């Protein structure tokens, strides 16, 4: 079964994220559990936790259908010790918030070397950051998102994801989220079913589908291999509809949150309905 939704706003209270997801007939959703552009947030209150859990129960969202995202400020591969510790503390807090809310996944961007350390050293720091967070939490899986490779961001190669996983001690609590726009911008072609087959065969060999815990379904304003992260509405960008139809018809993508981060929230309900319909359409030639 496909879980299909969008990254919805939690403005006015975390419970509102579940309500907003239900309003667009989503069977999955993503959210920030705190302001994503601030380091600190007030601790979750018992009322906030209870209201969020009640809303999820009311609208039939289990933790398997929810893919929270951490703060954009966090860099788990930071080359400077003081800044690395600040990011690690913030990431632990994000993981603990998920644990309190009964959520089992936390999606994050791996990190950046800032041209100050090697890719290998940065990837090792990211893995160690995950190990520290896993040691201080229970029941939450750290879900590494692939990136477009802008600037010094790592995670734009499947090999980067594999290297991080290799350095994580508890393999049962690490996974990946593949963003289609990021993959395309990083040089993984998705424009035809044949290219999708090739890209995900590469993913299967390098990382493995057992680690796939979520996806971000985004078309791309950015061009192929540009290393630029610019999302677009489904079918409106340089990837096109075929990739998303192909994903909907492949059971390897069942049972994980498939999350829209497309640029027009006003048509999310239409995009979700279209994705759902593709599951029963005739397979792409």
Swiss-Prot record:
The keyword Signal does not apply. InterPro entries: AP_endonuc_2 (IPR001719), AP_endonuc_F2_Zn_BS (IPR018246), Xyl_isomerase-like_sf (IPR036237), Xyl_isomerase-like_TIM-brl (IPR013022). Keywords: DNA damage, DNA repair, Endonuclease, Hydrolase, Manganese, Metal-binding, Nuclease, Zinc. GO terms for biological process: base-excision repair; DNA repair. Binds 3 Zn(2+) ions. Can also bind Mn(2+) ions. Belongs to the AP endonuclease 2 family. This is Endonuclease 4. It comes from Escherichia coli (strain K12). The gene is nfo.
């Amino acid at each position: 079964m496909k879980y299909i939704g969008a990254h919805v706003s939690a403005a006015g209270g975390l419970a509102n994220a579940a309500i907003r997801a239900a309003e667009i007939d989503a069977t999955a959703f993503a959210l920030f559990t705190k302001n994503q552009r601030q380091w600190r947030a007030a601790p979750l209150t018992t009322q906030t936790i209870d209201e969020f859990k009640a809303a999820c129960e009311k609208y039939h969202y289990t933790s398997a259908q929810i893919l929270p995202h951490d703060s954009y400020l966090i860099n788990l591969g930071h080359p400077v010790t003081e800044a690395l510790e600040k990011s690690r503390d913030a990431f632990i807090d994000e993981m603990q918030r998920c644990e309190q809310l009964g959520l089992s996944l936390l999606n994050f961007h791996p990190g950046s070397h800032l041209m100050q350390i090697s890719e290998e050293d940065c990837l090792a720091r990211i893995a160690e950051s995950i190990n520290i967070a896993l040691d201080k939490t229970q029941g939450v899986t750290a879900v590494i998102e692939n990136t477009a490779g802008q600037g010094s961001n790592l995670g734009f190669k499947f090999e980067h994801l594999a290297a991080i996983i290799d350095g994580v001690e508890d393999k049962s609590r690490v996974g990946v989220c593949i963003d289609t726009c990021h993959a395309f911008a990083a040089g993984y072609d998705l424009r035809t079913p044949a290219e999708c087959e090739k890209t995900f065969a590469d993913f299967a060999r390098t990382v493995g589908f057992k680690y796939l815990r979520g996806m971000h379904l985004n078309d791309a304003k950015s061009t192929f291999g540009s290393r630029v992260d610019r999302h677009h509405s489904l079918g409106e960008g340089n990837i096109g509809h075929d990739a998303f139809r192909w994903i909907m018809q492949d059971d390897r993508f069942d049972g994980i949150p498939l999350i829209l981060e497309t640029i027009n929230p006003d048509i999310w309900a239409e995009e979700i309905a279209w994705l759902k319909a593709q599951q029963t359409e005739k397979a792409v030639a």
